[in-house]
């Protein structure tokens, strides 16, 4: 089986996947900056929810005892794990999307994998994808107290297609082309969902 990741990278990625949304406030960073000025100041207004999730995840990882030099890990290996966890979590900030895709380096592989997993519902069966779409719209309505992305009780499919074409397909294409052997179906499945959503635009 062909792979581009060593076991330590895989471990780091799994930790990042578990913790990347541990401080998801249910709103975007712009709304969070307005509601939590203290967090905005703490992180200089950059990647707020991702920054908090990163800090919490690393603190829990250190407290867990999983990274101990007496368990055979070297200082450089511990630093490597913490770096991969941190950069992978921070890469899920969509405002950094273009910047992250352009890196296209071996070190960026974990970030692309995590971003793909974060957006993976676009590559799921249609009925599963629709559940995620409606859940996301409900979350936005609850937390922003306005109808975001919804018109007369229906999903704004034009906005959904724009999001997918801007963020999702490019991420999956990068995954398929540069990171993971055999991941092309994710792109094809997502493309099919996007085309079906495009048919619903009114």
Where are these regions (language model features)?
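Divalent metal-dependent phosphate-bond-processing catalytic cores, especially two-metal-ion Mg2+/Mn2+ enzymes
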Residues: 1-7, 15-202
């Amino acid at each position: 089986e062909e792979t581009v990741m060593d076991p330590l990278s895989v471990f780091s990625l799994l930790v990042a996947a578990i913790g990347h949304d541990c401080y998801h406030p249910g709103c975007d960073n712009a709304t969070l900056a307005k509601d939590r000025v203290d967090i905005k100041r703490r992180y200089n207004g950059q990647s707020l929810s991702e920054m908090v999730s990163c800090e919490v995840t690393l603190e829990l990882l250190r407290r867990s005892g999983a990274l101990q030099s007496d368990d055979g890990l070297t200082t450089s290996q511990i630093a490597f794990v913490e770096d991969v966890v941190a950069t992978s979590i921070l890469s899920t900030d969509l405002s950094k999307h273009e910047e992250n895709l352009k890196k296209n380096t071996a070190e960026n592989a974990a970030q692309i994998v995590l971003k793909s997993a974060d957006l993976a519902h676009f590559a799921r069966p249609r009925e599963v994808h629709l559940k995620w779409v409606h859940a996301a719209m409900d979350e936005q309505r609850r937390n922003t107290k306005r109808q975001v992305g919804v018109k007369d009780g229906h999903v704004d499919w034009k906005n959904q297609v724009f999001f997918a074409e801007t963020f999702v397909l490019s991420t999956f294409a990068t995954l398929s082309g540069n990171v993971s052997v055999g991941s092309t179906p994710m792109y094809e499945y997502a493309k099919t969902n996007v085309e079906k959503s495009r048919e619903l635009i009114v």
